Amino acid sequence: FHLVYATSTNPDQRRSAAVIQQMFQQIYIDMTISSVEIAQHLQRMQQHDFDIANASWIADFNDASNFLDLLRTTADNNYGGYSNPKYDALMDKAQQTVDLKERGRLMEQAEQLALRDYAWLPCYFLLTMDIVQPWVKGWIPNIRGFNRTRWLSTDSRPKD
């Protein structure tokens, strides 16, 4: 059995592709890695021109819909072409629900459905660790790991 793994030339993605290739070899699946520049990689994903592809997503706001909306049938970034009317209906209902607990429950059901359907196969999650001295003020931990320096200030640095 042979698969082509589409990825960009990003060093992290190439390393993860090599690890996945080794894992597939252990179960007797031959995998070729096809690395191209990011613009070409995005284009082939939009055209669904791949067997398996590495797609990355970074949450730009703190809500589960940031990831779950990607799997809606009509989503622009639904590169795998996942389509499940039950999933879409759950997400539509969640979008219209103002009760946060109910909304969360609906999105959890949608997530479980997508996992059961293998709509995605998450390989890894990026982690950022911020080490900030106590005299730095204005630093707010957030999902994007983003703090503008114009909002930062410092108190007197303690003497050693």
Regions found by a protein language model. Name each.
Residues 1-9, 31-34, 51:
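Short, well-ordered beta-strand elements
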Residues 9-23, 41-160:
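Detector for C-terminal structural segments
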Residues 25-39:
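Short, well-structured beta-strand/strand-turn elements
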